[in-house]
Amino acid sequence: MKYVGLAYFTPEKFAAMAQSDVKALVSQCPALDEKMRATGKLVVSASLGDLEGWKTLRPRGGKTQVIDGPYTEAKEVVGGLFIIDADSPDEALRLAGMHPAATLGEEGGWAVELIPLDFYLAP
């Protein structure tokens, strides 16, 4: 079964970190990403762009309305995502636990939300 992992961060907490701490934190991510990739269960992993570039599209009166920024104002924001293909819920938790946002970044408000996918359309 496939699962999507949403990697969250708290912009205010992340912005309050010293640049040297941010660099030290981010420098640890590639090794954890590679550990996850080495399982052969990672379908895709992505880091999302800056919030200033986000757009929300909504149907309104038969037309599509485009709004700048994230859909909701929230304390935590999705900063990345991944999709894994796990044989069981326990394996999904183990795999998601390898993601940097699940193991590092407490000071930046990092967290992972793991969600089973009901539908997945591959290209």
Residue spans for each PLM region:
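Conserved, structured core segments of small domains
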Residues: 1-123
